[in-house]
Curated annotation (Swiss-Prot):
NCBIfam families: arg_catab_astD, PRK09457.1. It comes from the Bacteria. CDD domains: ALDH_SGSD_AstD (cd07095). The gene is astD. The keyword Oxidoreductase applies. Belongs to the aldehyde dehydrogenase family. AstD subfamily. It catalyses: N-succinyl-L-glutamate 5-semialdehyde + NAD(+) + H2O = N-succinyl-L-glutamate + NADH + 2 H(+). The keyword NAD applies. This is N-succinylglutamate 5-semialdehyde dehydrogenase. NAD(+) binds at G224, S225, S226, P227, T228, G229. Transmembrane segments: none annotated. GO terms for biological process: arginine catabolic process to glutamate; arginine catabolic process to succinate.
């Protein structure tokens, strides 16, 4: 495969200038895309192009910006099957799920327009000091870092509101999903986005460090792992003038508490733990069940159902529930994590296994870690669910909050009283009741606390960090007051 011109700067495709890398099909290991990482020089060109485009883009009437964003959504809809196929090939996500990702990208446009008007619109009122006006301005040049698990939907959740607000962008996707990022940028160009408004730099850590360190950016919007987010936070230390929005991972608890519908509880747990092969930041990582005969009966049903989940290629017919994890490296990391927990006292209830020698396909795994003395507070990004048995609901809440993360938490129980207490006491930015933990609405804020984020939730609240408020007192004419301040004469 030939090396592509992988950087998009000021409306032109350029050679990246850095080290060459590939995107591989996680299951077949076929090369899907080959390009070069953006060098420091190309990163600088991209930032400069965004800076030059900012003046005209930011001054363009918001209705014109929205027209272009709406055209982008129309083009996504027209090309949705091909785009879903690209997502499926590059991530191993089954087509049924890849289609929902493209649909989410389309829906994000209308939601972002509504959020812009509601969260960052114009308000006016007469006050004692004069006429008060609140408006919002774009920050300027924003870097957007995207993850691999939702290579379209998640960066789109930053890019769309940032463009509506009048910012220009330098986009650095995950080095594991460069192909879909390229396809997205091509659609933006086709939608009529002016040159320089959206620029693309490909690459891994070195490219990200260079972009984050560039003095020409006014902020950075990040979705990804907690270690990378913490690294960016350290890199931004001493730079309070830069906006930094971090949406990171979680070690999310899901509590099962009687009474509950057994089939409903099993379904929601399976979906929470294993959808996307466990590669959603909101996936349940820790399952808290009562240490009773009823709790054991629930686990027996869960394990039997998990063992029957279908795993396979993204385009298999009939469709599987799960595809593979993102890479062979990710597969090996998950198997190593399972082995480590077992060595530390965990009891494997359903073994996570590699299903093909040179493929990233993993079967679901469930491991009882109740007896692990020093349970690591880590996000294992794959199809492995850890079980903790609790004595009573006080103990369940204690275990749920025994994490430095704070992204998502869920309760499966018919008891409203337990839920009311759970909502008040659990520490998380997303709290679900009798719904899958992975269920979240773009019409609501999305984000967490602690090691899961820095209190700048995305989704509906992305509008808040894509523009800053400007408070104004206005009068048609400067007039001296009827009574001057003490010690003043005119």
């Amino acid at each position: 495969m030939t090396v592509r011109e992988s950087a998009f700067v000021n409306g032109r495709w350029l050679a990246g200038g850095g080290v060459e890398f590939e995107s591989l099909d996680p299951v077949t290991q076929d090369c899907l895309w080959k390009g070069a990482a953006a060098s420091d020089d190309v990163v600088g060109q991209a930032v400069q192009a965004a800076r030059q485009a900012f003046t005209s883009w930011g001054r363009l009437d918001v209705s014109r910006r929205i027209d272009i964003v709406k055209r982008f959504a129309e083009l996504l809809e027209e090309d949705k099957e091909r785009l879903a196929d690209v997502i499926g090939k590059e991530t191993s996500k089954p087509l049924w799920e890849a289609r929902t990702e493209v649909a989410s990208m389309v829906a994000k446009v209308g939601i972002s327009i509504q959020a812009f008007n509601e969260r960052t619109g114009v308000s006016e009122q007469d006050v004692a000091a004069g006429h008060a006006v609140l408006k919002h301005r774009p920050h300027g040049v924003l870097a957007v870092f995207g993850p691999y698990n939702f290579p379209g939907h998640l960066p789109n959740g930053h890019i769309v509101p940032a463009l509506i607000a009048g910012n220009t962008i330098v986009f650095k996707p995950s080095e594991l999903t460069p192909w879909f990022a390229e396809e997205t940028v091509r659609i933006w160009a086709k939608a009529g986005l002016p040159d320089g408004v959206l620029n693309l730099v490909q690459g891994a850590r070195e490219t990200g460090v260079a972009l984050a360190a560039n003095d020409g950016i006014d902020g950075l919007l990040f979705t990804g792992s907690s270690p990378t987010g913490h690294s960016l936070h350290r890199q931004f230390g001493g730079r309070p003038e830069k906006i930094l929005a971090l949406e990171m991972g979680g070690n999310n608890p899901l509590i099962i508490a009687p009474p509950y519908d057994l089939k409903g509880a099993v379904h929601h747990t399976l979906f929470s733990a294993f959808v996307s092969a466990g590669q959603r930041c909101t996936c349940a990582r820790r399952l808290l069940v009562p240490d009773t005969a009823e709790g054991q009966a629930f686990l027996d049903e869960l394990i039997a159902a998990a063992a029957n989940l279908q795993v396979g290629r993204y385009d298999a017919d009939p469709q599987p529930f799960m595809g593979g994890v993102i890479s062979l490296r990710a597969r090996d990391q998950m198997l190593a994590a399972q082995n480590k927990l077992a060595a530390e006292g965990g009891r494997i209830l359903l073994e996570m296994r590699s299903l093909e020698e040179n493929a990233s396909l993993l079967s679901p795994g469930v491991i009882d870690v109740t007896d692990v003395q020093e349970l690591p507070d880590e996000e294992h990004f794959g199809p492995m669910l850890q079980v903790l048995r609790y004595r009573d609901f006080d103990h369940a809440l204690e275990l749920a909050n025994k994490t430095g993360f704070g992204l998502a938490a869920g309760l499966i129980s018919d008891s409203r009283d337990l839920y009311d207490r759970f909502w008040l006491e659990v520490r998380a930015g997303i709290v679900n009741w009798n719904k899958p933990l992975t269920g979240a609405s773009s019409a609501a804020p999305f984000g967490g606390v602690g090691a899961s984020g820095n209190h700048r939730p995305s989704a509906y609240y992305a509008a808040d960090y894509c523009a800053y408020p400007v408070a104004t007192l206005e009068a048609d004419q400067a007039q001296a007051p009827a009574q001057l301040s003490p010690g003043m004469s005119l």
